[in-house]
Regions:
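Short polar/charged helix/loop
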Residues: 2-209
Length: 209
C-alpha cells in the first residue's frame, strides 16, 4: 500500500486538503480524533461502516474517501464499508462527483440498484459499491466503527448492533440541489468536505504526520 499507487488526479486532489484542516470545527475534530484512536487501537484490522439513511450519497463518499485516505496516509489494513437504514441506489450525482475528484467508477450491473466497481489506484483492490442496509451481509457484523453521516440515520439508529464505536458526524445532504443549476457545485462541495474530514482522521490515525 503506497500513496504512489493512487491515481494522479486523486493524488493532486488529496494534496490540497490539509490546507483546509484548520477550517474543521474543533467539536468535529474531537470526533475525528476518536475515530483515529479506534483505528490505531485495531493495529491494522480496523473496519468502519459509514451510514446515512438511504446509502445513496454521503455514506458512499465517506466509504471511498476513507479507503483512499488510508492509502494516502499509510494506514495499514483499514477496510471501509457503507450502509443505510434502507437501501435505494448509489445516486448518479454522487458517482459523478467522485469521478470528478479522481476515482474511477464503473457500473457493473443493470437495474434500480446497480452494482458499481470503484477504484482509486493502479494496484489497489477495486471496491464493490451498491446501496444496502448497514447490516447487510456485505458489511462486517461486529467490532466495527459506525460513522453516522446524516442526522436522520443518527436519530433512527441510537444503537447500532455490533458496532464497537458509534460516532455522529453529519454532513449537509447535496440532494437539496438535485435538478437545479447548483447541482454540480453542491455535490462537489459535499465531496470535498467529506474527503477533508476523513483525511484529517487518517492523518491522525497515522500519527499526525
Amino acid at each position: 500500500m503506497s500513496k504512489a499507487n493512487l491515481f494522479e488526479a486523486l493524488r493532486q486532489y488529496l494534496s490540497t486538503l490539509p490546507a483546509g484542516f484548520s477550517h474543521i470545527p474543533e467539536p468535529r475534530k474531537a470526533i475525528l480524533r476518536s475515530l483515529a484512536d479506534y483505528i490505531r487501537k485495531q493495529k491494522g484490522g480496523a473496519q468502519i461502516v459509514v451510514i446515512c439513511t438511504h446509502n445513496s450519497r454521503r455514506s458512499h463518499m465517506g466509504q471511498l474517501w476513507a479507503a483512499a485516505a488510508a492509502t494516502w496516509y499509510g494506514v495499514e489494513g483499514l477496510k471501509a464499508f457503507s450502509g443505510g437504514t434502507e437501501a435505494t441506489a448509489f445516486h448518479p450525482n454522487a458517482v459523478a462527483a467522485l469521478k470528478r475528484a479522481g476515482f474511477q467508477i464503473t457500473r457493473k450491473t443493470p437495474g434500480k440498484n446497480p452494482v458499481y466497481e470503484a477504484r482509486y489506484g493502479e494496484d489497489e483492490p477495486a471496491i464493490e459499491v451498491f446501496s444496502k442496509r448497514f447490516d447487510d451481509d456485505a458489511n462486517p457484523g461486529r467490532g466495527y466503527a459506525a460513522i453516522m453521516v446524516c442526522s436522520e440515520a443518527d436519530e433512527a439508529c441510537p444503537f447500532v448492533p455490533g458496532a464497537a464505536l458509534r460516532l455522529s458526524l453529519p454532513f449537509e445532504d447535496p440532494k437539496r440541489a438535485d435538478g437545479t443549476p447548483e447541482e454540480e457545485q453542491a455535490y462537489d462541495e459535499a465531496c470535498r468536505l467529506i474527503a477533508r474530514e476523513f483525511c484529517f482522521a487518517m492523518q491522525e490515525a497515522a500519527g499526525g504526520e
